[in-house]
Amino acid sequence: MAKIKIAEYREVPEGDMRKFDAKGVPIAVYKLSGQIYATSDICTYDGCFLDENHRMHNYMVECTLHNEQWDIRTGEVVIPPASEKLKVYKTEVIDDDIYVDVV
């Protein structure tokens, strides 16, 4: 895995997410209770970008087009119609910079 600086910690609002690009890969970065999480930004049900069509429910991200939800900690589907989990990326904060491990 390659660790890439993707954002500054302050760029991600608490309780929400922002989309960043990591070597051409759209990544959704979330901040909840000060912790940073990252998943693919692409809905596994219809391929839209989650950052453009989402609502947060604690550790769940909902795609508002079809109301499916995933747990951002594991990528697991919590509410269908999606059946495929979101890809989850390992994150690390170093000196207020957010790093994500991408392939």
Please name every model-derived segment:
Residues 17-103:
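Rieske [2Fe-2S] iron-sulfur-binding domain
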Residues 1-21:
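Zn-dependent metallo-beta-lactamase
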